[in-house]
Amino acid sequence: MAAARRAAGLLPLLLSSPSRARLPHRQALALTPPLLRPHRLYSHSPKPSSSAAFSAFASASNGAPAGRARELHLYNTKSRRKELFQPRVPGGEVGMYVCGVTPYDDSHIGHARAYVAFDVLYRYLRYLDHKVRYVRNFTDIDDKIIARANQLGEDPFSLSKRYSDDFLSDMANLHCLPPSVEPRVSDHIDQIINMIKQIIDNDCAYAIGGDVYFSVENFPEYGDLSGRKLDDNRAGERVAVDERKKNPADFALWKAAKDGEPSWDSPWGPGRPGWHIECSAMSAHYLGHSFDIHGGGEDLIFPHHENEIAQSRAACCDSSINYWIHNGFVNVNSQKMSKSLGNFVTIRKVTELYHPLALRMFLLGTHYRSPINYTIEQLNVASDRLYYTYQTLQDCEESCQQHQSKAGDPLPVNTTNCIQKLHDEFETSMSDDLHTSVALAAISEPLKVMNDLLHTRKGKKQEKRLESLSAMEEKIRMVLSVLGLLPSSYYEALQQLREKALRRASMTEEQVLQKIEERTSARKAKQYEKSDEIRKELAAVGIALMDGPDGTTWRPSVPLSEQGVVAST
C-alpha cells in the first residue's frame, strides 16, 4: 500500500507517454520527463567538478549582468506585506540575526527548514553584492537543557555542547554556510545583566525575590508584531505562572537560582537569564540596537519576538529592526512538527537514507513562508530530481572537459535566449520574496536542452554544441550555488545518491547486479513474464533498470508499486 501511494503522484506522467519505453535509449532519454529520466553513472572517475560548493558561491555575486537593477522584496511580518529591501546603511553591511537552537536533543527537519531558508537569504543577499553580518545564536542554558541533563545525569553545558556540535555538523551537511558569528548565551551574561539594568532604570521591569519581570503594561506597543491585544496575550511556553507578577503576561528577564541549576551572580542575587532577553542582548552586542533583518520560525512571533521587541525598545528607545522574516512550519499529518509534540523526525535520521541535499531540495520545493507537509514520497521525488540534475551536469562536464572555448565566440541565438531566460526567471523569482520553488523550476528547460544536445542525433549535430553545453552548465551551476545545491563533485554526489538508494531498498549493489543477471538470462530464454517481474520487484523499492546497447544498468528512482505502470520489457 505504501508503494502504491508513492506511485500515485507519478501515474499521470507515466500514462501520458506509454510508448517511450520502446524508443531507443538515447531518444527516450531526451523525451522523458525529468523526474522519470533514466540516468547513467560512469564506471570511471572523470575529473571532479571544477566548482566546489562553497568556493563557487563566494564568486556567485558576479552572476548577474553589471549595472542591472535587482530589487529584492521581502515579506515583513510586522507590516504584513512585501516590502522593498533597503539596507539601513546604503552600501554598508547588512545586519541579520536569526534565532538559533536550544541544543538539548538532535535537531529535526523543522530546524532544517528554518536554517536552510535563512541560508538562502544570506546567499542571495551576497549574490546581490551586499556585505552581510549574519548572527545565529545558541541558547545553551535553558529549562529544557537542564531537564534533559538531569534526566541523563549529565552536566548541562556538556550536553548543550554535544548537541551544538551535532547541529553544526547537520548544517554543514545541508550546505548551510557558517554564520559570521555564533554566540552562546553562557558567554554573554554580562551583556544580558547590563540590558536588564537598563530596562529596570527605564521603569519597564521590576524585581521580586531574586526574579526580574518585564512589565508589559509599561510598554504600550506590546502586541504590534503578533497583532495580539494585551488582554488576549498569554504567557509564553517557557514563562512559568507566578502570582507575584503584576500582569499574567509579564515575562521573566532573570530567574532566581534553584538548587542544582547553573547560576551567575547578579544585582538581584544568583540566577540565570530568561529565554527572551538572551537574543535581545546578543543581537545588540553584535549588530547594534538597530539592524536590518531578524528572522526565525513563525512559532517565534509570539511570545519570543514580541518580547524581544519590548525588551530592546525598553532598554534603548531608538532600537528598531527593519524587517521581521518568518518561515512556515514543517507539518506531519497536518500538525506542526516539534519536539514538544513528539512527532519530529531528526535530520540525522533522514540523512541516513537520503542525501542531505535531497532534503534541502525537498525544503526548497515549497516557498519558505508556506507550510510544508513532510512525506517520504516527496523526499523520493526530490532525490530523483537531484539525481537527474547532477547526472545531466556530469554528462555535460565529461563531454566538455577536453574542449576549450575561444574567447568572444558568439553562441547560437537559441542558446543565448535559453541562458538569458534562466537568468531572468531565477532573479525574478528570488527577488520576489525568495520563491525558491520557481527558481528550481527555471532550470528544467535548460536541463532538457542539454540532454537533447548530449544524447539525441539532432542535438549532436547542432552548431557550437559544446560551447552551448558549457555555457548552460555554468549558468545552472550559478543557480545551484546560490540555492546551496552545488556539490563539490557531481560524480561523487551521484555515487552517494546511489548508495542511499541501495540503503533504502535494503540491497547491496551486488544483489542488484545479480537481479540484472537473472533478468538478462530470462530475456534470453524468452521468459518475459519473469523478466517483467524482476523489473517490477526492483522498481517497487526504487531501483530502475535501463536497457541499452551496452547491456542493462540501474539508477535510483521514485519507488513504484507492483501494480504501478512500469515500462514493459
Swiss-Prot record:
Q: Which residues bind ATP?
A: K339
Q: Where is this motif: 'KMSKS' region?
A: 336-340
Where is Zn(2+) bound in this sequence? C99, C279, H304, E308
Q: Which cysteines are joined by disulfide bonds?
A: none
| NCBIfam families given in the database record | cysS (TIGR00435)
Short sequence motif 'HIGH' region: positions: 101-111
Q: State what protein this is by name.
A: Cysteine--tRNA ligase CPS1 homolog, chloroplastic/mitochondrial
Please tell me the species this chain comes from: Oryza sativa subsp. japonica (Rice)
The note on cofactor binding and number reads:
Binds 1 zinc ion per subunit.
Q: What family is it from? A: Belongs to the class-I aminoacyl-tRNA synthetase family.
Please name the GO terms of the biological process aspect recorded for this protein, alphabetically: cristae formation; cysteinyl-tRNA aminoacylation; polar nucleus fusion; regulation of programmed cell death; regulation of translation
Q: Does the keyword Zinc apply?
A: yes
The protein's matches in SMART domains, at most eight in alphabetical order, are given as: DALR_2
**InterPro entries (UniProt xref):** Cys-tRNA-ligase, Cys-tRNA-synt_Ia_DALR, Cys-tRNA/MSH_ligase, CysS_C, Rossmann-like_a/b/a_fold, tRNA-synt_1_cat_dom, tRNAsynth_Ia_anticodon-bd
What EC number(s) is this enzyme filed under?
6.1.1.16
**Transit peptide, first to last residue?**
1-42
Keyword match Nucleotide-binding: yes
Question: Which chemical reaction does it catalyze?
Answer: tRNA(Cys) + L-cysteine + ATP = L-cysteinyl-tRNA(Cys) + AMP + diphosphate
Q: Where in the cell is it found?
A: Plastid, Chloroplast; Mitochondrion
Main subcellular localisation? plastid
Protein's job: Nuclear genome-encoded factor required for normal assembly of chloroplast polysomes.
Pfam families annotated for this entry?
A: CysS_C, DALR_2, tRNA-synt_1e
Entry cofactors:
Zn(2+)
Task: Identify the HAMAP family for this entry.
Answer: Cys_tRNA_synth
Keywords for this protein: Aminoacyl-tRNA synthetase, ATP-binding, Chloroplast, Ligase, Metal-binding, Mitochondrion, Nucleotide-binding, Plastid, Protein biosynthesis, Transit peptide, Zinc
